[in-house]
UniProtKB/Swiss-Prot annotation:
Biased composition range(s): Polar residues: 689-700
PANTHER family per UniProt: KIN OF IRRE-LIKE PROTEIN 2, NEPHRIN
Chain positions with Phosphoserine modification: 563
Protein's name in the database: Kin of IRRE-like protein 2
Taxonomic source organism: Mus musculus (Mouse)
Assembly and oligomerization: Homodimer. Interacts with NPHS2/podocin (via the C-terminus). Interacts with NPHS1 (via the Ig-like domains). Interacts with FYN.
Gene that produces this protein: Kirrel2
Extracellular side: 20-507
Transmembrane residue ranges: 508-528
SMART domains attached to this UniProt entry: IG, IGc2
Domain of life of the native organism: Eukaryota
Entry-linked Gene3D superfamilies: Immunoglobulins (2.60.40.10)
Subcellular location: Cell membrane
GO cellular component assignments: cell-cell junction; plasma membrane; slit diaphragm
Amino acid sequence: MLASALLVFLCCFKGHAGSSPHFLQQPEDMVVLLGEEARLPCALGAYRGLVQWTKDGLALGGERDLPGWSRYWISGNSASGQHDLHIKPVELEDEASYECQASQAGLRSRPAQLHVMVPPEAPQVLGGPSVSLVAGVPGNLTCRSRGDSRPAPELLWFRDGIRLDGSSFHQTTLKDKATGTVENTLFLTPSSHDDGATLICRARSQALPTGRDTAVTLSLQYPPMVTLSAEPQTVQEGEKVTFLCQATAQPPVTGYRWAKGGSPVLGARGPRLEVVADATFLTEPVSCEVSNAVGSANRSTALEVLYGPILQAKPKSVSVDVGKDASFSCVWRGNPLPRITWTRMGGSQVLSSGPTLRLPSVALEDAGDYVCRAEPRRTGLGGGKAQARLTVNAPPVVTALQPAPAFLRGPARLQCVVFASPAPDSVVWSWDEGFLEAGSLGRFLVEAFPAPEVEGGQGPGLISVLHISGTQESDFTTGFNCSARNRLGEGRVQIHLGRRDLLPTVRIVAGAASAATSLLMVITGVVLCCWRHGSLSKQKNLVRIPGSSEGSSSRGPEEETGSSEDRGPIVHTDHSDLVLEEKEALETKDPTNGYYRVRGVSVSLSLGEAPGGGLFLPPPSPIGLPGTPTYYDFKPHLDLVPPCRLYRARAGYLTTPHPRAFTSYMKPTSFGPPELSSGTPPFPYATLSPPSHQRLQTHV
C-alpha cells in the first residue's frame, strides 16, 4: 500500500510539473488454470483519458464493465491511473495476447500472453480394469490420456508405490497445436506370481503436479505349475511306490500324462500313479506332464531303489599260451554297489577283489573255470555269480588207457587220450613196423573219437584207437607209441599189449558142456516118465508150473506124497479119449494162459527151473572184451518143453508143437502098453530109493 501511494504521489507531482503520460505498470505473461480467475495489471501516470484493453488486437471497449464480455471487467481507481483486466472463470478461448492502451496519449503496453492450463483427466488403461496376460509370454499395458489437457501430461507406471521402468511414451499433436492423445505403453513379461497384482498409470502435468491415477489388475493365464513327489522316496526292489502329481493352473488343468524313462505309462490317468519298484526306476525317472488351455509343464523324479547285483558285462573265456598273462573282467551293478570277488571253481580262496582278475605268467595248472561273485552290501538283496574258463595253450598231454589183454591171433585194441590247446595238428601211432595217423595199414586200423570233457580247461580232447586184427607174437613185445603235436610242442606215451592164455577159456567151455549134459539128462528123464505115465491113464495131463495158479485147486490132499522141501515140479495129468482118426488141428500155445493144446490135451510145463522159480543159466565168460560177443554163451531153448507123448492102442504118436522137443528120441517098433512082470507096480520108479536131488512127483 505504501508503494502504491508513493507511485500515485509521484505521478501527480510530475503532472503538476508538466510530465508526459507513461505506464507505471504493464501486463506480463501469465498462466492460469482453466476455470480460475486471471488478472492482468495496467497503471498509467500523467494521463487523464480513455484506457482500453485489446485481445489479440481486438478492442474490448472503454467501459469498466466491458459490455459484451460477461466474464471480463476492468478494476482499479481510474483517477489514479489503475486499469487492471480481470477474467473469471478462465476458459480455453481466453488464451490470447492482451495489451493495455492509452488511446489519447497513443500509448500501448507490451503484449502479455495469457496461457490457460487444463489439468489432465484420469488416464485410461486399454483393456482395464482387469487385463488378461499369459505368464511367461511377453506382453504390454497401454495407458492413454486424451486431449484437452494443457500442457500435455506425463504418464507414469507404478506398482506398490514404486515406479516401473520399461515404458514407451508416445504423443499425438492436433493440427491446431493443441495437445492430442498421449499414450504410454509398459512392456513386461509376467510370471504366475503376478496374478492379481495391481498396477497404476498416473497422468501428471504443471496444471496438476500430483497427477491423477488409474489402476488396473492383472489376470494371468499360466500353464500348470507342477510339483511331483514319491512316497516312499527310498524303496527296496519289489515294494510299492505312490507318485503324487500336484498342479496349479489358470485356466484349470485339462489332463495328466505319466512317463517312465521317456516312454508313456499306459493306462495311467489322474494325479496319482502306483507302481512296483525295480532297478530301472533308479536310472529311468518317472515324469508327470500336466496340461491346460495355455500350455503344459513337466516334472520328473527318480527313486532311490535298493536292489541286488545285476550282471552287466559277463566275463569272457580266454585262451593264452603258457607263461603269458591272463585277465578276466565282469561288471555288476546294484544299489548299493555290490562287493565283487574272484575264486576258482570249486575253491573258496579269494583270488582278487574288484571287477578284474589278473593272472600273471599262467601255468598249465592254472587252466580251469573262474567264478566272479557279487555279494550285496545290504541283506535281503540276493547275490549273483558268473564264470569263465581259462584255457592254457601248451604242448599236448597224452595219456594211455590200459589195454585189455588179447589172444594170440585174436583182435586187440589200444587207446590213448589227447588233450591239447590249441588242438593237435596230428595224432600218430608208431611201432617197429611203421606208423599210422588215420585209416588202415595191413592189420592195423586207426579211429578217433571226441573225448568226454574234463575239468581243468585242458582244451578239447580226443580218443585215438589203434585196432589190431590177428595179433602176432611180435605185437606182445613191441611198444606202441601214441604221439600228438601242435604249434607249442609234442606229447607222447608208449603202450604195451598184454597177452591172454587159452587155459581159463577151456575150463569155462568144459564147465558149460558139463552143465548142458546134466540138463539134457534131466529133460530126458522127465520125458520118459511122462510117456510111461500116459500109457496107464485116460485123463488129461496137466504139468503145473511152480508159482502158477492153474491147476492148484484140482489137487487133493491125497496127492501130497512128500515134504515141501523134497517136492520138485508137480505133474498133474488129466486123460481124455483120443483117436487118431480125429481131424482136429493142432493148436499153438495160447499166450494168455501158458498152455499147449493138442487135440484136447492141455499141458503146461516148467522144467529146468531153480528152486526159487528162476531158470539157471551159466554165468557169462569173464574174459570177454567190452563190446565183443561172449564166447560159449550157453542158453538152450528151455522156455518151451514139449508135452508128453500120449499113447493109445491102435494109435500112432501125436506130433509135438515144438520141432526141437524130442530130437534124440527113437520111435519104437511096436505100439501098445509096455509088458510088465507080475508083481511090478504100475509105476516102476515108485520103488526106487529117494534121489538126492529134487524128485518128480506124479499125481493120478
